Amino acid sequence: MSEKLSKNVILLSIVSFLTDISSEIIFPILPMFIASLGGAGLIIGLIGGLSDSVSSILKVIAGYWSDRIGKRKPFVFFGYGLSSFSKILLSFSTTWHHAVVLVSLERVGKGLRDAPRDAILAESSEEHRGRAFGFHRAMDTSGAIIGSALSFVLFYYLGLSFETIIFAAGIIGFFSLIPVLLVKEKDKKPVKSSLELSLKALPGDFRMFVIIASIFALGNFTYMFFILKAQNVFLILNPAMAIAIPLLLYVWFNIIYAAFSMPVGTLSDRIGRRKILIAGYGLFALTCAGFVFSDSLAAFIVLFALYGVAYSLIDATQRAFASDLISENIRGTGLGTFHTVIGLAALPASLIAGSLWQYVGPDATFVYGAGMGILATALFVLYSLKSNN
């Protein structure tokens, strides 16, 4: 049995690699760019929350329509193209109002492409789906590492303006469309049913998994709180390094995440995705608990590495496992539903974490994350036992 990756998997992974280089060039400077346009902290939060909401809601709709017309590639191409075009326009923004519209439009592109793209990945890798999704996430994260480094070089060393950097990132994004053109879909019959009927056709095992994954997502708050915890510690230990060290730790997290994603995907094909997810949810809980007690550079190096391993165990494996549970004719709808529910759960997750951080204390945020990780682990173990029986 060959483990060779299919052409579609490689092409779509290159697409995500280039797109993440483009996006991660922009993300580190976006808050400063918005502030330079007159947007205060509330506006920055509004842009982040609104864009995520728009993206999440569209995913189930795009997934359904890719099933309905029997074509996924047009959604992938148009989604990536819209995101790149929005980045170009963002570079010409003169007020924060423009930024609100254009960042949201960029997320519309993400909402259109994610579920159909994941459906193509699943349909192109029936035997080694975990390996395929793992490779895709590894390429995606590798692009994020390069993009973040380029942003730092372009801004701090070359002294380029926000507008020039964002424009250049948009151009890089357009190069991601070339591999999409080479993707070849399998022939599929259009599914002539309403969205409501397609949702009702989703199997019970899949629905239960989405519930458990969304419970985990409620505790899987934004990575920024992990960075803030490190920054708070180093403001006391070494104020001069309070910004540099947390950023380097974030890069370290991404390196570990990228390094483990493909091996974990391959392992999930061999030993089963249930074991990988149980390990991932449990390790996330352990990592959050560790952040409660961390107070040294050595501790943070270990914990950010564990955070990266946990993400590699969870992210691609959840997508592959969800794909396993859905028949091909409604896979776009199913993966769109999965992405939508997880995306919507992520919003209150960070609001709860932020409220605990501000009103109770930083440690409370990580206690909450550990608790939700333990709950998700327990529920998934019960789910697996019931499914096996």
What kind of region is each of these model predictions?
Residues 1-6, 185-212:
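Juxtamembrane intracellular "pre-TM" segments in multi-pass secondary transporters
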Residues 2-52, 208-236, 242:
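Helix-loop boundary and gating motifs at the non-cytosolic
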Residues 32-36, 146-164, 348-364:
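Transmembrane alpha-helix termini and helix-breaking/packing motifs in multi-pass membrane transporters
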Residues 52-60, 144-145, 254-262, 343-347:
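Residue-level signature of mid-helix packing/kink "hotspots" within the transmembrane helices
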Residues 74-88, 170, 275-290, 370:
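Structural signature of the two symmetry-related core transmembrane helices
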Residues 89-103, 292-303:
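Helix-loop junctions at membrane interfaces in 12-TM secondary transporters
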Residues 102-142:
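Cytoplasmic helix-loop-helix junction between adjacent transmembrane helices
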Residues 170-189, 376-384:
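C-terminal membrane-cytosol helix-exit motif in multi-pass small-molecule transporters
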